[in-house]
Structure formats: structure tokens, C-alpha cells
Amino acid sequence: MNTLEQTIGNTPLVKLQRLGPDNGSEIWVKLEGNNPAGSVKDRAALSMIVEAEKRGEIKPGDVLIEATSGNTGIALAMIAALKGYRMKLLMPDNMSQERRAAMRAYGAELILVTKEQGMEGARDLALAMSERGEGKLLDQFNNPDNPYAHYTTTGPEIWRQTSGRITHFVSSMGTTGTITGVSRFLREQEKPVTIVGLQPEEGSSIPGIRRWPAEYMPGIFNASLVDEVLDIHQNDAENTMRELAVREGIFCGVSSGGAVAGALRVARATPGAIVVAIICDRGDRYLSTGVFGEEHFSQGAGI
């Protein structure tokens, strides 16, 4: 490997040792935090920029625009720095300090909208900026180069790493790029694989997973590629995230906890299943939020 972009992908797939049910099923997780900018979004970020370059839509020195809740923005900021683009990122102001700091460290310009405006507001502002000629909108929510990254890399890797044994694929749904691309690839293989998507329960807030209003449903989403959608409560996602750290040694974020909570639900209901879930990022991106309970230790509680 000679360049940073060549280190994106080919992430490890590991079997959970202690959290899975004792019914002959197996839960395997793909450690996307091993990508250079720390998340599964490295794949889509690289794909959206490289494919746009191939079509002659952008060139180094151009301004790129994107709305993000964090991971895509960090990944795009990394690729923009690597390739010589100027990156403008729109993000709600209730996202973690680590995300803001990482984007700025890569040299991106960060524009915050209010938490009340949310991702919908960030998307609207990104579109308006693009229409005013302030830069090229990459539009991860409607850009087919997003799922294409997972069709050409993530899906084939999972199939190869499980030697085709996979029976269920479980993925949190945000932009839906991961589940759409992986499912499309798995649908083309010689055996059926059940595709399970995850969204937050009504009233739950899980960073990186969305329950989109109909008018904001990502254009890349193809409902025919998803067999089942599970609702995940915020508490289940957070508790599973913490369990992964202390029982499996896997330090990940809340949406990854949600994915594994869903995988556990599938495995318990399906003896003998080979379930694969995506660990989409690392836990260090969430420390300032207190979700791991570290604020109690800083106050001396429990010591």
C-alpha cells in the first residue's frame, strides 16, 4: 500500500465471544473504525469524490459541500485534505465536540445549524449553498456513489470473510448507503441472505441512525433490498455499546451498539444463524457526551 486511500476498506470481521446467545447462532461484526478516518463513511467519502472526478464534475481546488451528522464529514474532510479540495460541512450543533474538532483538524470549514433544525435543516442549507454557486454538493443522501462503495467493497468483503456462510446482515440506517449497497451485492449471490435494517424507536435519538420523515427519505434507499426493519430504543443501543466495550473489548459508538442490539435480537430468534453487523465507528468520538458514564468517574462517583 502506497497511499492513504488504499488503506480504506478490507476491515476485520470478528466473532463476538461473550454476548451471543447459546443456540448455535454466531454474531460477527465488521470493525469499520479501523478505516483511517475512523468509520465506515470513509468508503462512501472516497467513492463520491473519486467517481465525481472520473466524470469530470470536480477537480482539486474546488469547494465541496456536504451535510453531515459527523462521520461522513470527518471522512470527507480527510479525503479533501488528501486530494486538495476545500470542504464545507453543515452539521447540527448538538453533535459531539470530538466530531467538530476532527473536521476542523483536517482543515474543513464547519457551519453549524441548531439542533432544532437538525439534519433536515443542514441538508436544506447545503442545497441552498450549492444553488447559490458556493460549491459542489456531494449529497450523500441521494448520490448513488454512496451505496456503490458498499456494493463494490463492503459486500464482497463480508461474503469472502464469512466464506458465504452469512444468513443475516444487520445494519443501522442513516443515509442507507451501507445497507443498500451491501444488500444489492448479497442479493446477487447464490444463497438467500436476510437483510435487516435498524431505525430508532419513535422518540429515541441515536447518532448516525435516523427515522426520516417521508419528504427527507434518502433517494438512494431501495425498500425492496431490505427484508425487515427493527425499531431500536436509545437505551438498548447505549447499553449494548457499553457491553461491547466491557465484555468484548470493542470500543464503538451508539449506532454500532444499536446494530449489535438488533443482531442479538435476530440471533436469539434464529438458532444456527450466521449474523453479520456493522460496527461503523469508534467510541472515542462520543466520550464528551457522557454516554459511557465517564462523567461519573470525573466527579469521583464509584471510586
Curated annotation (Swiss-Prot):
Keywords, sorted A to Z: Amino-acid biosynthesis, Cysteine biosynthesis, Pyridoxal phosphate, Transferase
Catalytic activity: O-acetyl-L-serine + hydrogen sulfide = L-cysteine + acetate
EC class of the enzyme, as a word: transferase
Family matches, as InterPro entries: Cys_synth (IPR005856), Cys_Synth/Cystath_Beta-Synth (IPR050214), CysM (IPR005858), P-phosphate_BS (IPR001216), TrpB-like_PALP (IPR001926), TrpB-like_PALP_sf (IPR036052)
Cellular component, GO, one term: cytoplasm
A Pfam family hit: PALP
Residues that bind pyridoxal 5'-phosphate: 71, 174-178, 255
Gene3D superfamilies linked: 3.40.50.1100
Enzyme Commission number(s) from the entry: 2.5.1.47
N6-(pyridoxal phosphate)lysine found at: 41
GO BP term, example: cysteine biosynthetic process
Pathway note: Amino-acid biosynthesis; L-cysteine biosynthesis; L-cysteine from L-serine: step 2/2
Reported cofactor(s): pyridoxal 5'-phosphate
Record carries keyword Lipid biosynthesis: no
GO molecular function: cysteine synthase activity
NCBIfam families linked: cysKM, cysM, PRK11761.1
Protein family according to the UniProt entry: Belongs to the cysteine synthase/cystathionine beta-synthase family.
Function: Two cysteine synthase enzymes are found. Both catalyze the same reaction. Cysteine synthase B can also use thiosulfate in place of sulfide to give cysteine thiosulfonate as a product.
Protein name, entry field: Cysteine synthase B
Organism: Salmonella typhimurium (strain LT2 / SGSC1412 / ATCC 700720)
